[in-house]
Amino acid sequence: MSGAGSKNHLSETPTIHPDAIVVDCDLGAWTEVGKSTQMRASSMGDWSYITQDCHVVWTSIGKMCSIANGARINPGNHPTWRAVQHHSVYRAAAYGLGEDDHDFFAWRKADWVTIGHDVWIGHGVTITAGVTIGTGAVIGAGAVVTRDVAPYTVVGGVPARLIKRRFSESQAEALLEIAVWDWSHKEYKAALPDIRKLDIDDFIAKYRVRSGSGNGSA
């Protein structure tokens, strides 16, 4: 990941920093994984990127997502309902206590995090197990997200709470229908000037008509 004002040249082949650890993951086109990030048993859609020093496991990340430094997505839960919640209870083999608790790991693995499209996750965010982040949401820096986040809302704090909506419900519904993240590279490139310059209502008015074909082409 490059510094401010510049960026690596990406391609349809995922760009993974040599110091990153990516295991059993499915990465889309134009994706990037930054330095010292660990990503395991997860998927990430086209255009999305994860910057430095993030940990991600058992997570589905949509397209066009932006994940800032130090994010922790689906950190492991401990068995708080048991008399002892320490590692040794479920990682018993490491302590010479017998077999690991495979049922516990199956329970943990089943509790995926799901992140929609075009989501911005700020620096140092933690997203706990089982949470769904709606498309277009913004998660403020340092937030701890313990509940689902609605599409096109801004949340922040510990625990994360609603701060505001980015757009009205009708505008959000229109953007979900237009689904820019599903456009081809060519279509997206052609629309980029409008994305930069048009206000939200003008953008919706122009591109909602085109979305009936399932893409952003004229």
Regions picked out by a protein language model, each given a short descriptive name:
Residues 3-131:
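Flexible, glycine/small-residue-enriched loop-and-beta-strand segment within the central core
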Residues 12, 17, 86-127, 159-218:
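C-terminal segments of enzyme domains that contribute to small-molecule binding surfaces
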Residues 77-79, 149, 165-167:
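Conserved catalytic-core motifs of eukaryotic protein kinase domains, centered on the activation segment
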Residues 120, 138, 154-155:
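Short-chain dehydrogenase/reductase
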Residues 123, 141, 151:
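Catalytic-loop Lys-Pro-X-Asn motif of eukaryotic-like protein kinases
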Residues 134-137, 150-152:
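Conserved catalytic segment of ABC-fold P-loop ATPases
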Residues 138-140, 144:
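A generic "structured core" feature
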Residues 151, 156-159:
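Acidic, glycine-centered active-site loop in nucleotide-sugar glycosyltransferases
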